[in-house]
Amino acid sequence: MKIVEKLYLCDDNALRLMDKQLRYNDFSNFLSEYFPHKVQKISLNAGFTCPNRDGVKGYGGCTYCNNQTFNPAYCRTEKSVTQQLEEGKQFFERKYPQMKYLAYFQAYTNTYGELERLKSMYEEALSVDGVVGLVIGTRPDCMPDSLLDYLEELNKRTFLLVEYGIESTDDEVLRRINRGHSFACSAEAVERTAMRGIKSGGHIIIGLPGEAYTHGTPDERKEALNVMCDRLSALPLTTLKLHQLQLIRGTRMAHEYEQNPEECKRYTADEDIDVVIDCVERV
């Protein structure tokens, strides 16, 4: 569903929320605490892969994944980080000439590589005119201490948000979608990141096959959803992104759905909104 595609929950900023009559802190409010001007994320594809794609932890990647479905046209690995950012800027500058930007390392696992290569790409992005910070999307099992050492230093001189793909708090669901890590791994990564003073975000997909809150009686579904929210609330997350499940043609999950449609709950728009509201109220 596209009604609520992404929702961020952030701490503090209560007065601003009251002024806007919001019951949660959205991402734009969160950014306004750090920047006096409008800020836009620009997605990047820096040519990384994932350990559940290259054989280290498995093959094929996550069963729902097809990065090309959300990457902008300019995100091509044959283009440098700088070129991708400049092309992304051109799109927004037509409407907002004073816009500033966050370089969003989004595609695949953006901490999965040699430390010097990672540092070079991050620093290249920060050198582009108008870029005022980084958002780095990654997996919880791809954050070595050596990289955290560097990110801790980087965090002292620029805006930095590390966004972890948690996806589910249920280990059986994580196994089913071929994530290759546990929820405990996610919790540990978030805690280690927060201990360094680095802002961390969590990404959750609502409605994955096998989630307990997608089946059973209404009371059973609500209780299962509360369990997930309580697990997330216990983490020292700065932001939380809730994303609806999308079945993309050609993915393994789409094939599984074609074979056994009853195994995957397809929410209506109203049901999707109700689940998000329940999550917001709980966390």
What name fits each language-model region?
Residues E263-V283:
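C-terminal accessory regions of radical SAM enzymes
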Residues T82-K89, L118-E123, L148-E152, S186-V190, ...:
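Generic structural signal for well-ordered alpha-helices
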Residues E93, Y122-D129, L151-F159, E191-M195:
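Acidic (Asp/Glu)-rich catalytic clusters
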Residues Q68-G88, F92-L115, G130-M143, F159-S186, ...:
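Core AdoMet radical
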Residues I206-T217, T238-Y267:
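Flexible glycine/acidic-rich beta-alpha junction loops that bind and position SAM and/or redox cofactors
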Residues G210-L232:
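Catalytic cores of alpha/beta
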Residues M1-T63, N67-L102:
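N-terminal [4Fe-4S]-dependent radical SAM core
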